[in-house]
Each structure stands twice: as structure tokens, then as C-alpha cells.
């Protein structure tokens, strides 16, 4: 697809004039976006032909509407990411609270287990004392 753009009132024309210092051009330049080439249609003066200015073909221009659409889509994508991150943060916070509760419960169970072991040890000591007494009684 070829696009015909007038040189007058274009930024590229002024940039080209700065590069060549002198030079006049009347006509059009045609950008072929498929081949990324530039064709000229019009009259050059001698100085303009000698300096052979290079036109940046690979640069692409975006309209304000296209930019706003891109910006809006980007903003929507970012808000989606923010909401998912917020939801994940909330889940992590809830899981952290659950872990703390489980740790507290585990500590309580550990303490009860220690108490049970202490009572069993006391019972074992009593039984040993009773065995010793029985042995003494039997030996008499």
C-alpha cells in the first residue's frame, strides 16, 4: 500500500532541509510500507540531489486515537493484573493467619503431651516404688 504525502508542512521536510543546509523540493514523496522504501515525485535542485538526504522509513507514526486505544487497553490489562495480585495477596494473608492458628494449636497440643508424659512418668515411678515394696514384703 502506497501512501502519498506532501513534503510541505511536514516535519521530515524541515529535518531534511537542516541536513542539506540548502535545497528546495517541490512535489511529493511516496512511502511504500511493504518494501520500506521511498519514491520521489517532483523536482529537486542540484544541491538537494548532491547531498542525498536519508529519509527515515522505518519510523512509524501513531494517531492520537490509536495511542489512546493502546493506552486504554494497557490500563485495562494493568488493572486486571492489579486485581489478581490483590486477590492473591489476600489469599496469602488468610493462609498466613491459618498457619499462625495451627502453630498455636500445635504448641497447645505439645504442652498437653508433655503433661501426659509427666503424669505417665509419675505413675511409672509409683509403680516402681510399689514393686520395690512388694519385693521387700515377699522377701520377708
From Swiss-Prot:
Instruction: Kindly give the InterPro entries that the UniProt entry links to this protein.
Output: DUF16 (IPR002862)
Top-rank taxon of the source lineage equals Bacteria
Pfam entry (one): DUF16
Identify this protein by name: UPF0134 protein MPN_094
Family in the record: Belongs to the UPF0134 family.
Amino acid at each position: 500500500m502506497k501512501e502519498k504525502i506532501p513534503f510541505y508542512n511536514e516535519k521530515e521536510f524541515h529535518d531534511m532541509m537542516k541536513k542539506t543546509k540548502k535545497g528546495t523540493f517541490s512535489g511529493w514523496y511516496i512511502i511504500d510500507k511493504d518494501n520500506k522504501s521511498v519514491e520521489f515525485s517532483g523536482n529537486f535542485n542540484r544541491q538537494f540531489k548532491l547531498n542525498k538526504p536519508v529519509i527515515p522509513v522505518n519510523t512509524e507514526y501513531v494517531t492520537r486515537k490509536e495511542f489512546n486505544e493502546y493506552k486504554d487497553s494497557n490500563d485495562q490489562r494493568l488493572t486486571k493484573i492489579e486485581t489478581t495480585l490483590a486477590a492473591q495477596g489476600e489469599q496469602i494473608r488468610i493462609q498466613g493467619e491459618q498457619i499462625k492458628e495451627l502453630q498455636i494449636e500445635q504448641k497447645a497440643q505439645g504442652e498437653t503431651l508433655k503433661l501426659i508424659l509427666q503424669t505417665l512418668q509419675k505413675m511409672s515411678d509409683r509403680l516402681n516404688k510399689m514393686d520395690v515394696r512388694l519385693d521387700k514384703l515377699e522377701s520377708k
